[in-house]
Regions:
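Short acidic/polar active-site loop segments enriched in Thr and Asp
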Residues: 108-109, 208, 227
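Metal-dependent peptidase/peptidase-like ectodomains
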Residues: 147-186
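Generic non-transmembrane alpha-helical segments
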Residues: 14, 18, 164, 168-179, ...
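His/Asp/Glu-rich mid-to-C-terminal helical/loop segments that flank catalytic regions of hydrolases
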Residues: 239-275
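Active-site/ligand-binding-proximal alpha/beta "capping" segment
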Residues: 172-208, 275
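Zn-dependent metallopeptidase/amidohydrolase metal-coordination segment
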Residues: 212-251
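Non-catalytic positions within long, well-ordered alpha-helices that form the structural scaffold/packing
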Residues: 103-104, 203, 222
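Metabolite-binding pocket within alpha/beta catalytic cores that recognizes anionic/polar moieties
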Residues: 1-157
């Protein structure tokens, strides 16, 4: 067996032992500032990344580094309270190991969330954006020998985000009076924030929001034909002109995401309830 697969199955076996034979219907990835989403999970089973054999550990601001398994929307789910980023120095097989492990656990759906910078001038801080498509500027996690037990060598990416889940989210948000955006997310390596020229370039090629994560997770999920729903919290607004004292700040990103967390939690919970 490929050493990467061995690591995935070893991690999954450790997690399985703590789930008492229960199979999660969905995996959820909680981005910067969205960790309190996990507080909504009932009868939680907490599994620390640092205790899982061969597992990477989150070092980013606002990422605690736990799996939380339990009940959400009447369904058994497993959530990542903190993700792994490429900019932390991990290779892509470790960045995506948590998603692969959840695949082995038996998830049928993947929900991903992130804090993202607004590129579209219409977007405001605190807006929720459904991710309808993405642009990847990170290394592709499928580079290297294919893991045949997870999917084909050349997976199709025509529909990276599930249209039925998107339609359900819009229906739920409309009923609750929660305004939603829908746009294209572009993922860069980070950890430096974007220059004004890069923001202009990203807007020119069709991106609406920018971040440093999510896309590798979506690629490996789709490699295994797992339906994906993605949502961004816009944590800073696009600037037509950058003031002399303008500055991106990680703490501000976390605060803005935290302020929108309840709305995102409601939408995710209601979708999961409907599965």
């Amino acid at each position: 067996m490929d050493p990467r697969s061995e690591k995935i199955f070893k991690a999954a076996d450790y997690i399985k032992e703590r789930l008492d034979g229960r199979v999660p219907v969905a995996g959820i990835v909680l981005g910067s500032g969205l960790g309190k989403f996990a507080e909504k999970i009932e009868n939680p089973i907490v599994i620390h990344y640092k205790d899982i054999p061969g597992f990477p550990v989150s070092t980013a601001i606002g990422h605690k580094g736990n799996y939380i398994a339990g009940e959400l929307g009447g369904k058994f789910v497993i959530a990542m309270q903190g993700r792994i980023h490429y900019y932390e120095g991990y290779p892509m097989d470790l960045v995506t190991l948590p998603i692969r492990a959840m695949k082995v656990l038996g998830i049928s759906y993947l929900f991903v969330s992130n804090a993202a910078g607004g590129i579209n001038f219409d977007y405001k801080v605190g807006d929720l954006m459904i991710i309808k498509d993405h642009i990847n500027l990170l290394p592709n996690p499928l580079i290297g020998p294919n893991l045949d037990e997870f999917g084909p060598r050349f997976p199709d990416m025509t529909h990276p985000y599930d249209k039925k889940l998107i339609a359900k989210a819009k229906e739920i948000a409309a009923e609750a009076g929660i305004p939603l955006r829908e746009g294209v997310y572009i993922a860069g390596t980070g950890p430096s924030y974007e220059t004004p020229a890069e923001w202009h370039f990203f807007r020119t090629i069709g991106a609406d929001a920018v971040g440093m994560s999510t896309v590798p997770e979506v690629i490996v999920a789709r490699h295994s034909e797992i339906p994906v729903f993605g949502m961004s919290v816009i944590t800073n607004a696009a600037q037509k002109e950058f003031a002399a004292d303008y500055k991106n700040d990680g703490d501000d990103v976390v605060k803005a995401a935290d302020a929108a967390a309840d709305k995102m939690t409601y939408i995710f919970t209601k979708i999961i309830e409907s599965l």
